[in-house]
């Protein structure tokens, strides 16, 4: 077997920003105590991976990107009890240590052991398990799935149903859960309410699905790419608007569409500061809630009129849909297996891992929702 040995395998490496990923052979060290080595079988391409490549989301390079995935445990380090070799698993970019303030709180889900904000690009012990040509490679947000094998901390992996199709449930590792949870878990959308979703990519469409599941009576999709509208309507949007079709700001358009009231809930699923303030301004001045779901660029700051908040609006962020990862991912996989929701409409392309750069080109061109790479 491979347990306890260095594994040589294929990975896509980001050596520098604004360059295609490079598929090369890397060495993956065995897991240390409380770590798990996973054979990745399916991984989705998410806009957040592209934000690192573009330089918008600052991370230390070289790095093995990818964070939306599913696979099988190859081996475990000393002291690991939550999974065993052969288990089907999903790596978690939001860990759940069970001990920190966020994990202990019923209201929190962003475990403080996450590497989203610190951006060290390393394992919790401050080292890497990846090398290429004698050079150490960084890990990406506790996961790194653009590789045949990865190593994660035991707080960043969870066992799922052995019968689950990994090429579909990999989306529960990020895109689906992030959007769906923003509606049902973070916003707690109420039946009969009106929602607006800004950005109709994979996460935005999942937010649309969440609004529908929560019983929203109107779900307005907002995107400057009208090619996204048919799919949004298929997923539950009752109408779609393109801000480029109007002379007035989109928040005024949404007020007009709601009889001057504004929407009950708005979701910004793009990651732009201008659309974040527009989404806030689109919701009801008193009890409206706006959720920031899109990953904001590292360097950006936001300016807005405090009057927007003073009247009673709520502005809230949501990471991984507000779900506590270890508690929720297995349950979401079970719900999928029980056909409580479908992931098929989100997966527009399936391709071999070697075509990863083509997958990113489809994303940038607005031609895909989710591309799933198979090893």
Curated annotation (Swiss-Prot):
<dbReference type="InterPro" id="IPR002328">
    <property type="entry name" value="ADH_Zn_CS"/>
</dbReference>
<dbReference type="GO" id="GO:0005829">
    <property type="term" value="C:cytosol"/>
</dbReference>
<dbReference type="InterPro" id="IPR013154">
    <property type="entry name" value="ADH-like_N"/>
</dbReference>
<keyword id="KW-0963">Cytoplasm</keyword>
<dbReference type="Pfam" id="PF00107">
    <property type="entry name" value="ADH_zinc_N"/>
</dbReference>
<feature type="binding site">
    <location>
        <position position="103"/>
    </location>
    <ligand>
        <name>Zn(2+) 2</name>
    </ligand>
</feature>
<feature type="binding site">
    <location>
        <position position="174"/>
    </location>
    <ligand>
        <name>Zn(2+) 1</name>
    </ligand>
</feature>
<keyword id="KW-0520">NAD</keyword>
<feature type="modified residue" description="N-acetylglycine">
    <location>
        <position position="1"/>
    </location>
</feature>
<feature type="binding site">
    <location>
        <position position="228"/>
    </location>
    <ligand>
        <name>NAD(+)</name>
    </ligand>
</feature>
<dbReference type="InterPro" id="IPR036291">
    <property type="entry name" value="NAD(P)-bd_dom_sf"/>
</dbReference>
<comment type="similarity">
    <text>Belongs to the zinc-containing alcohol dehydrogenase family. Class-I subfamily.</text>
</comment>
<dbReference type="Pfam" id="PF08240">
    <property type="entry name" value="ADH_N"/>
</dbReference>
<dbReference type="GO" id="GO:0042572">
    <property type="term" value="P:retinol metabolic process"/>
</dbReference>
<dbReference type="GO" id="GO:0004745">
    <property type="term" value="F:all-trans-retinol dehydrogenase (NAD+) activity"/>
</dbReference>
<keyword id="KW-0479">Metal-binding</keyword>
<protein>
    <recommendedName>
        <fullName>Alcohol dehydrogenase 1A</fullName>
        <ecNumber>1.1.1.1</ecNumber>
    </recommendedName>
</protein>
<feature type="binding site">
    <location>
        <position position="223"/>
    </location>
    <ligand>
        <name>NAD(+)</name>
    </ligand>
</feature>
<feature type="binding site">
    <location>
        <position position="97"/>
    </location>
    <ligand>
        <name>Zn(2+) 2</name>
    </ligand>
</feature>
<feature type="binding site">
    <location>
        <begin position="199"/>
        <end position="204"/>
    </location>
    <ligand>
        <name>NAD(+)</name>
    </ligand>
</feature>
<dbReference type="InterPro" id="IPR020843">
    <property type="entry name" value="PKS_ER"/>
</dbReference>
<feature type="binding site">
    <location>
        <position position="100"/>
    </location>
    <ligand>
        <name>Zn(2+) 2</name>
    </ligand>
</feature>
<dbReference type="InterPro" id="IPR011032">
    <property type="entry name" value="GroES-like_sf"/>
</dbReference>
<dbReference type="GO" id="GO:0042573">
    <property type="term" value="P:retinoic acid metabolic process"/>
</dbReference>
<dbReference type="InterPro" id="IPR013149">
    <property type="entry name" value="ADH-like_C"/>
</dbReference>
<feature type="binding site">
    <location>
        <position position="111"/>
    </location>
    <ligand>
        <name>Zn(2+) 2</name>
    </ligand>
</feature>
<dbReference type="GO" id="GO:0008270">
    <property type="term" value="F:zinc ion binding"/>
</dbReference>
<feature type="binding site">
    <location>
        <position position="46"/>
    </location>
    <ligand>
        <name>Zn(2+) 1</name>
    </ligand>
</feature>
<feature type="binding site">
    <location>
        <position position="67"/>
    </location>
    <ligand>
        <name>Zn(2+) 1</name>
    </ligand>
</feature>
<comment type="subunit">
    <text>Multimeric (with different ratios of monomers).</text>
</comment>
<feature type="binding site">
    <location>
        <position position="370"/>
    </location>
    <ligand>
        <name>NAD(+)</name>
    </ligand>
</feature>
<keyword id="KW-0560">Oxidoreductase</keyword>
<keyword id="KW-0862">Zinc</keyword>
<feature type="binding site">
    <location>
        <begin position="293"/>
        <end position="295"/>
    </location>
    <ligand>
        <name>NAD(+)</name>
    </ligand>
</feature>
<keyword id="KW-0007">Acetylation</keyword>
